From Swiss-Prot:
This is Transcription-repair-coupling factor. It comes from Staphylococcus aureus (strain COL). The gene is mfd. Its EC number is 3.6.4.-. Couples transcription and DNA repair by recognizing RNA polymerase (RNAP) stalled at DNA lesions. Mediates ATP-dependent release of RNAP and its truncated transcript from the DNA, and recruitment of nucleotide excision repair machinery to the damaged site. GO terms for molecular function: ATP binding; damaged DNA binding; DNA helicase activity; hydrolase activity.
Length: 1168
C-alpha cells in the first residue's frame, strides 16, 4: 500500500492537513472512513509520537483497525477492546479481548510508539494505577537471581492461577526447581533454577509438556487487566465494609439478607489466589487513585477523534445504562452504593490538555472553539458489481481526467486477472511502481480497504473489490501469539479422580487415583478402581492398557459393575453379537462397492479452472485437500461414496459446488438433496450466484415453487435441459426421472426419515455420492469401517472467522437490553433462545417492551412447517431484528447477519448442544457474541455447575470444546451405525465398542491380528521402582509417563523419556532411575526372545523362548559373559534355555549387562 501513501503525502492538500494535525482543536471534514484512515496512517508514519484514535464504539474500532492494518505494521497497531456493554464486568468472558487489552496497556506503560484505537467505553473504564501496572511488568534473563516466593506472589497479583500442571492461559506451576508459566501474550515458558539463579528459559508445548527453544530473556505480562495485591485487598475490604453499611439501610428489608450474602461472598478472598473474574466488579473500591487509559499515554501523544457528535450520543447512553444496571443490582441486594466501572467525567474533560484533531464526514456545529478547519472533497466510487460496460466508461473518465487510479484486489491471481480485464478495455495499467506513477493510468496492487473513495482535488481514485465485484473485504486478522496458542486440546482420555472407567475384564468402575502400595517389602504404583458396593480393584500400572476411560453420550451415567459377577460377561456377549451383525453388513456393502462400475471423469477442464478462480476467497488447506480427494474419486471407475465432515460455516458447500460443476462440465446431471426448504433455498441461491457466468441450468424443487414450476423442472430433468436440481425430499419422488444423473449430493443425511433413506440408497446405485455433515465422525470408527465410505474432514475455519466471544453471567433485563441494542446498532440480528414453548410469546412481549422499535419474530417446533419456514426465511432476509426461538435453530440455519446469541437458562443445556448453538453466530467477518445466562441466586445442581464451569472455559479450544466434541463424536457414530448401536456404545463405552467392531470386521475379512515377533516379556524384580508423589504430584502426568514407559520398545524412546522427566520435573530420584533400568532390561529382553525375568530372592531366573534358544550363538554369549564368572549358570528346560544369575553387589548392573549380551549374541547369530 506504499503506492497509495506515496501519492497522498506528495499532495498539497495532505501537507496542509499534516501541518495542523496534532495541534489543538483542529477539525477535518469531508473524508470517507477509508480516506480518513489513509490520512491518519500517513500522519502516524511521519511522526515519532503515540497516536490515540478514539471511536464511539468497539464495532467502529474494529472497522478502522481492519483498514489501518493495510498501512501499519501489526506490531505497532494496538486496540483497547472494551464491550459497549457495561455489565461485561459481571460476566465470565473469553480471553481474546483481555489479551488485546493487556498488550495495549503494556505497550503504553513501556512508552512504546504505536497507533492506539480506543472506543469511548475504554477511555472511561477504571484501571489499575499506571505506576502499579509498570511495577508488575517483568523481564527475566538467564543468569539473574530471583526471590522465588516474591516472584510467585507477584504472579498471583498479576492474575495467574497456580496449578500442578500448566495447560491453560493464565496458569503457573512450581515443580522442584522448575517454574512453568502460560502468559496471555506469547509462548508458554519454562524457567529452570539453580538455587535462586535462572539457569535456563525455554518455550514449551502445553500439549506434550516438552521444552522447545532456549531463549535468553522473556517478558511476562499480566494475566488480568487488573493488578490485585495484598494492599489492594486490604483497601478493598475497608471500602467494601463502608459501602455495605451505606447500602443496607437504603434498600428494601426483604433483600437485606441477599445483600449480606453478597458482602460475605466478596469477603472470602483467598490469599493464595485472588479471583480476578469476581473482583473486577469491585474495581471502584479497589484502588485509592484508579487511572483511566489516558493517563497511560505519553504527554506529547496526538489524539484523533472519529465523529465527535456520535461519541457524544454514545456518551449519553454510557451514563444512563450503567446507572440503571447498578440501581437494579443494588435494589436486588447484589451490589453496593458507589459501585461503578467508569469515570463519569465528560469526554472533553477526559482528553483535556492534549492536542486533539476531530474528524467528521459532515461539517457540523461543535461545542468547541476550533483553531483550524481543513475541508476535503471526497466522493464515493460508482458500484460496478461486475457490469463490464459501466466499469469501462468510468475507468475511461478517470483516464481522461488524468487521475491516479489505484485498484486494490485481495490476491496475486486477481492482480493478473484485473490487468487482463483493463487491457481488454484499453485502459493503461501497471502492477509495480518503479519510480513515480504517471497520472491517467491504473496501478493494480494487492490490498484491501472497506470501501473505495475519490478525492477530486487530489486527482486520486481508489477502487476496491467491493465496488468492482460486490465482494466483502476480508477481515484482516491481527494476531498476537496469545490466540494461536489458545488452549491446545489434550485428549479427552485424561483421567480425573471420580471418572468412570472400563476394565476389559471387569467392566465399568470408577477411577479413584494412583496409590503406592508396599507388597512384599517393595513399593509399586497401582491404579485404584471402585466397583459396585464396596468392591475395589488395584491394577498394577504396567497393566494399565486394560483400563480405558468410559466415554459415552453426555447425559449417560453408567451403572457400576460388580466384581466377580457374570453381569459384565453377559453385557459384552450381547454387544459382541451386535457388532458381528454390523460387521457382516459392512462386508457385504464393501464387496458390493468394489464390484460396482460407475462413470469415470476426465481431468479438470479449462472451464473448471476458470470457475474455481472466480471463488472470492482463499481456500483453507483442508478445503483444498477435500476437493482433491473428491476429484480423485470421480476420476476412478468405482462410484464415489464420500462423507465430507466439517463444522458449520467451514466451507463444505464450496467443495460440493466444485464437484457439481465438474459433473455438469462432462454432461452429467447433479441432484443436491437437503433436509429443509430453507436450506434448499440457501443452497440454490449459492449455486446461482457461483455459476451465473457459466451455461448451467439450475432449478429448485421445494414448497417455495408452484406446481407448474415443479412440473417444468421434472420435464427438464427427464430431457436433460436441467443440469442441477436442488430440493428437499421431493427429489426422492418415484415420478422423477433423470436423463443422466452423475452426482448425488446429500446434506445432513441423518436428518431424513427411514423411508427417505431407503430411497436415497436406490438412487445411489452406480452414481457418485457426496454426503455433507456438520456432526464430526470419529476417526477410530471410520478406520474400522474399512473404506465402505471414504472420509474427508475440514477442521480449519476460513481465514476471516474469529472465535465467538463467549460470556457466562446471571440473567438481568438491563443487560439483555444492552446486548440487543449493541447488535442492532451495528445493523445485525439476534437469536434469543428461550426453550419453553408454552410461554415463548410472553417472552416476545417482554422483549418488545424492552425494544419497542425492534421487529421480533417467534420460531418453535410446534408451528406448522410452512409457518416456521416462512418465519425463518423472513429472518434470513433481514425482515426481523430478533428471533425468539427454541433449539430448532441448532442445525442447518445460516444467517451470516445474526451475530449475537442470547440463551436463557443455559445451565439446562448439554455442552454439545451449546457448542452447536454457538456455531449459529460469528459466521461472517464480524465478531460473534454468545451470552449464556443462568438465573440469579439459583442453587445449581452439581452437573449444571460443572457444565457452566466448562462453558466458562468454552473459548476457542477449551475443555468445554473437548467434551462437546466427545459427545458429538458419539452422536456421529450413532448416525453412521444406527440408533440401536448408540445404546450399545453407551453400555460398554465408545473405545471398547470401537475396538470390538474393528476386531469383528477383521475376523470376517479373514485378517488376523499380527502376531508379535516376540512373546510378552514378564519382568518381576524386588525393587522400589515407581514414580514417587514427591517427584510427580500430578496424577494425570504420572499416568501419562507410565503409559509411555509401557509402550517403550527402543532405547531412543528411553532416552526421550529420560529427557522429558528432567525437562518437566528436574533430576529424578533413585526409585525412578530403577524404573527406567527395568524398562531398559525389558527392551533388551524384547529384542532377544527372553520371556521371563523373575527375582527369586538370592537369584534371578531368566527364561528364553524355544525359537530364541535355537537362534542364539552360545559361543559368543559365553565369551561375552566371562566377566560374570560363576554368578551365571545356564540350563535347558522344555527345549528352552534358562539362565540363573546369583545376586551380589550391583546385581542390577550385572543383569543389565547379561541381557545386553544375550541380545548381542542373538544379533550376531542372525547376521551369520
Amino acid at each position: 500500500m506504499t503506492i497509495l501513501t506515496t501519492l497522498i503525502k506528495e499532495d498539497n492538500h495532505f501537507q496542509d492537513l499534516n501541518q495542523v494535525f496534532g495541534q489543538a482543536n483542529t477539525l477535518v471534514t469531508g473524508l470517507s472512513p477509508s480516506a480518513k484512515v489513509t490520512m491518519i496512517a500517513e500522519k502516524y508514519a511521519q511522526s515519532n509520537q503515540q497516536l490515540l484514535l478514539i471511536t464511539n464504539n468497539l464495532y467502529q474500532a474494529d472497522k478502522l483497525e481492519t483498514d489501518l492494518l493495510q498501512f501499519i505494521d501489526a506490531e505497532e497497531l494496538y486496540k483497547y477492546p472494551v464491550q459497549d456493554i457495561m455489565t461485561e464486568e459481571f460476566s465470565t468472558q473469553s480471553p481474546q479481548l483481555m489479551s488485546e487489552r493487556i498488550r495495549t496497556l503494556t505497550a503504553l506503560a513501556q512508552g512504546k510508539k504505536g497507533l492506539f484505537i480506543v472506543p469511548l467505553n475504554g477511555l472511561k473504564k477504571w484501571l489499575t494505577p499506571v505506576e502499579m501496572w509498570q511495577n508488575h511488568q517483568m523481564t527475566l534473563r538467564v543468569g539473574e537471581d530471583i526471590d522465588v516466593d516474591q516472584f510467585l506472589n507477584k504472579l498471583v497479583n498479576m492474575g495467574y492461577k497456580r496449578e500442578s500442571v500448566v495447560s491453560h492461559i493464565g496458569e503457573f506451576s512450581l515443580r522442584g526447581g522448575i517454574i512453568d508459566i502460560f502468559p496471555l501474550i506469547g509462548e508458554p515458558i519454562r524457567i529452570e533454577l539453580f538455587d535462586t539463579e535462572i539457569d535456563s528459559i525455554r518455550d514449551f508445548d502445553v500439549e506434550t509438556q516438552r521444552s522447545k527453544d532456549n531463549v535468553e530473556e522473556v517478558d511476562i505480562t499480566t494475566a488480568s487487566d487488573y493488578i490485585i495485591t495484598e494492599e489492594v485487598i486490604s483497601h478493598l475490604k475497608e471500602e467494601l465494609k463502608t459501602a455495605y453499611e451505606n447500602t443496607r439501610p437504603k434498600i428494601d428489608k426483604s433483600v437485606r439478607n441477599d445483600l449480606k450474602e453478597t458482602y460475605e461472598s466478596f469477603k472470602l478472598f483467598e490469599s493464595t489466589y485472588f479471583d480476578h473474574q469476581i473482583l473486577r466488579r469491585l474495581v471502584a473500591f479497589m484502588y485509592e487513585t484508579p487511572s483511566t487509559i489516558i493517563e497511560y499515554f505519553q504527554k506529547d501523544a496526538i489524539i484523533a477523534v472519529d465523529e465527535f457528535n456520535r461519541i457524544k450520543e454514545t456518551e449519553e447512553s454510557l451514563t444512563v445504562e450503567p446507572d440503571s444496571f447498578i440501581s437494579n443490582i443494588i435494589e436486588s441486594g447484589n451490589g453496593f452504593i458507589g459501585q461503578s466501572f467508569i469515570k463519569y467525567d465528560d469526554f472533553e474533560t477526559l482528553i483535556e490538555g492534549y492536542p486533539v484533531t476531530y474528524f467528521s464526514l459532515f461539517a457540523t456545529t461543535m461545542p468547541i472553539k476550533l483553531n483550524h478547519i481543513i475541508k476535503f472533497s471526497c466522493k464515493p466510487v460508482q458500484q460496478f458489481y461486475g457490469q463490464y460496460d459501466i466499469m469501462r466508461s468510468e475507468f475511461q473518465r478517470y483516464v481522461n481526467q488524468n487521475y491516479h487510479i489505484v485498484v486494490l484486489v485481495e490476491t496475486e491471481t486477481k492482480v493478473e486477472r484485473m490487468q487482463a480485464m483493463l487491457s481488454e478495455m484499453h485502459i493503461p495499467s501497471i502492477t509495480k511502481l518503479h519510480r513515480s506513477m504517471s497520472s491517467g493510468q491504473a496501478v493494480i496492487i494487492e490490498g484491501s480497504l472497506s470501501e473505495g473513495f475519490e478525492l477530486p482535488d487530489m486527482g486520486l481514485v481508489v477502487i476496491t473489490e467491493r465496488e468492482l465485484f460486490k465482494s466483502k473485504q476480508k477481515k484482516q486478522r491481527k494476531r498476537t501469539k496469545a490466540i494461536s496458542n489458545a488452549e491446545k486440546i489434550k485428549s479427552y482420555q485424561d483421567l480425573n479422580v471420580g471418572d468412570y472407567i472400563v476394565h476389559v475384564h471387569h467392566g465399568v468402575g470408577r477411577y479413584l487415583g494412583v496409590e503406592t502400595l508396599e507388597v512384599g517389602q517393595t513399593h509399586r504404583d497401582y491404579i485404584k478402581l471402585q466397583y459396585k458396593g464396596t468392591d475395589q480393584l488395584f491394577v498394577p500400572v504396567d497393566q494399565m492398557d486394560q483400563v480405558q476411560k468410559y466415554v459415552a453420550s453426555e447425559d449417560k451415567t453408567p451403572k457400576l459393575n460388580k466384581l466377580g459377577g457374570s453381569e459384565w460377561k453377559k453385557t459384552k456377549a450381547k454387544v459382541q453379537q451386535s457388532v458381528e451383525d454390523i460387521a457382516e453388513e459392512l462386508i457385504d456393502l464393501y464387496k458390493e462397492r468394489e464390484m460396482a462400475e460407475g462413470y469415470q471423469y476426465g481431468e479438470d477442464t479449462a472451464e473448471q479452472t476458470t470457475f474455481e478462480l472466480d471463488f472470492p476467497y482463499e481456500l483453507t488447506p483442508d478445503q483444498a485437500k477435500s476437493i482433491d480427494e473428491i476429484k480423485d474419486d470421480m476420476q476412478k471407475s468405482r462410484p464415489m461414496d464420500r462423507l465430507l465432515c466439517g463444522d458449520v460455516g467451514y466451507g463444505k458447500t464450496e467443495v460440493a459446488v466444485r464437484a457439481a460443476f465438474k459433473a455438469v462440465m462432462e454432461g452429467k446431471q447433479v441432484a443436491f438433496l437437503v433436509p429443509t426448504t430453507i436450506l434448499a433455498q440457501q443452497h440454490y441461491e449459492t449455486l446461482i450466484e457461483r455459476m451465473q457466468d457459466f451455461p448451467v441450468e439450475i432449478q429448485l424443487m421445494s414448497r417455495f415453487r408452484t406446481p407448474k414450476e415443479i412440473k417444468q423442472t421434472k420435464e427438464g430433468l427427464k430431457t436433460g435441459f436441467v443440469d442441477i436440481v436442488v430440493g428437499t425430499h421431493k427429489l426422492l419422488s418415484k415420478d422423477i426421472q433423470y436423463k443422466d444423473l452423475g452426482l448425488l449430493i446429500v446434506d445432513e443425511e441423518q436428518r431424513f426419515g427411514v423411508r427417505h433413506k431407503e430411497r436415497i440408497k436406490t438412487l445411489k446405485h452406480n452414481v457418485d455420492v457426496l454426503t455433507l455433515t456438520a456432526t464430526p465422525i470419529p476417526r477410530t470408527l471410520h478406520m474400522s469401517m474399512l473404506g465402505v465410505r471414504d472420509l474427508s474432514v475440514i477442521e480449519t475455519p476460513p481465514e476471516n472467522r474469529f472465535p465467538v466471544q463467549t460470556y457466562v453471567l446471571e440473567q438481568n433485563m438491563s443487560f439483555i437490553k444492552e446486548a440487543l441494542e449493541r447488535e442492532l446498532s451495528r445493523d445485525g440480528q439476534v437469536f434469543y433462545l428461550y426453550n419453553k414453548v408454552q410461554s415463548i410469546y410472553e417472552k416476545r412481549e417482554q422483549l418488545q417492551m424492552l425494544m419497542p422499535d425492534a421487529n421480533i419474530a417467534v420460531a418453535h417446533g410446534q408451528m406448522t412447517e410452512r409457518d416456521l419456514e416462512e418465519t425463518m426465511l423472513s429472518f434470513i432476509n433481514n425482515e426481523y431484528d430478533i428471533l425468539v426461538t427454541t433449539t430448532i435453530i441448532e442445525t442447518g440455519v445460516d444467517v451470516p447477519n445474526a451475530n449475537t446469541l442470547i440463551i436463557e437458562d443455559a445451565d439446562r443445556f448439554g455442552l454439545s448442544q451449546l457448542y452447536q448453538l454457538r456455531g449459529r453466530v460469528g459466521r461472517s467477518s464480524r465478531i460473534g457474541y454468545a451470552y449464556f445466562l443462568h438465573p440469579a441466586n439459583k442453587v445449581l445442581t452439581e452437573t449444571a455447575e460443572d457444565r457452566l464451569q466448562a462453558i466458562k472455559e468454552f473459548t476457542e479450544l477449551g475443555s468445554g470444546f473437548k467434551i462437546a466434541m466427545r459427545d458429538l463424536n458419539i452422536r456421529g457414530a450413532g448416525n453412521l451405525l444406527g440408533k440401536q448401536q448408540h445404546g450399545f456404545i453407551d453400555t460398554v463405552g465408545f473405545d471398547l465398542y470401537s475396538q470390538m467392531l474393528e476386531e469383528a470386521v477383521n475376523e470376517k475379512r479373514g485378517i488376523k491380528e499380527p502376531e508379535s515377533e516376540v512373546p510378552e516379556v514378564e519382568v518381576d524384580l524386588n525393587l522400589d521402582a515407581y514414580l514417587p508423589t514427591e517427584y510427580i504430584a500430578n496424577e494425570q502426568a504420572k499416568i501419562e509417563i507410565y503409559k509411555k514407559l509401557r509402550k517403550t520398545e527402543t532405547f531412543d524412546q528411553i532416552i526421550d523419556i529420560k529427557d522429558e522427566l528432567i525437562d518437566r520435573f528436574n533430576d529424578y530420584p533413585v526409585e525412578v532411575a530403577r524404573l527406567l533400568d527395568i524398562v531398559e532390561i525389558k527392551v533388551h529382553a524384547l529384542h532377544s526372545g527372553i520371556t521371563l525375568i523373575k527375582d527369586k530372592g538370592k537369584i534371578i531366573d531368566i527364561h528364553l523362548s524355544v525359537k530364541a534358544t535355537e537362534n542364539i550363538d552360545g559361543e559368543v554369549l559365553f565369551k561375552a559373559t566371562q566377566p560374570l564368572g560363576r554368578t551365571m549358570k545356564v540350563g535347558v528346560q522344555n527345549n528352552a534355555m534358562t539362565i540363573t544369575l546369583t545376586k551380589q553387589n550391583q546385581w542390577l548392573d550385572s543383569l543389565k549387562f547379561l541381557v545386553k549380551c544375550i541380545e548381542e549374541s542373538m544379533r550376531i547369530s542372525d547376521e551369520a
